[in-house]
């Protein structure tokens, strides 16, 4: 698996590599899929998806972050592999997405409405704030699209006084859903 290079940064920072690995697993992208990311920021998830999906669209409302995505795509040899849109979702969301990643919590209700209306098969939303995780979980339930909630925390070891200690990242709440009518048992 190719390493993702992120030489260009954005204030929000990238989705961590371990979290991206779980996102990729939950999305289970194939070369037949149209993947859409809302809130591309550094492009870390977009880059991973561009290696798996046949078609990729990334939306980012902030022009400077979209430029960061563009630069990081180029640094990974994927400059022409992704359609970039400077828009605030749900505006300009494609109606033919097979898989959707929501990287931020802004307007997620409207994004989930769009996903439910268009029958997106695989939906993943990452949340780092507890209150948003609870509200977003309820939003998935209200639309009858919730299939799974995962909470995890990554810690990296470092040397401390000749032994190993751990530096912990913030926990991530991952909401997984489907608006296609398929259940997990059907997949």
Curated annotation (Swiss-Prot):
Pathway: Cofactor biosynthesis; adenosylcobalamin biosynthesis; cob(II)yrinate a,c-diamide from sirohydrochlorin (anaerobic route): step 8/10
Gene: cbiT
Binding annotation for S-adenosyl-L-methionine: 15, 39-43, 60, 89
One biological process term in Gene Ontology: methylation
Catalysis: reaction(s): Co-precorrin-6B + S-adenosyl-L-methionine = Co-precorrin-7 + S-adenosyl-L-homocysteine + CO2
Domain of life: Archaea
Documented EC number(s): 2.1.1.196
InterPro entries (alphabetical): CbiT, Cbl_synth_MTase_CbiT, Cobalamin_biosynth_MTase, SAM-dependent_MTases_sf
Keywords: Cobalamin biosynthesis, Methyltransferase, S-adenosyl-L-methionine, Transferase
GO terms of molecular function: cobalt-precorrin-6B C5-methyltransferase activity; protein methyltransferase activity
Family the entry assigns: Belongs to the methyltransferase superfamily. Archaeal-type CbiT family.
Protein name (Swiss-Prot/TrEMBL): Probable cobalt-precorrin-6B C(15)-methyltransferase (decarboxylating)
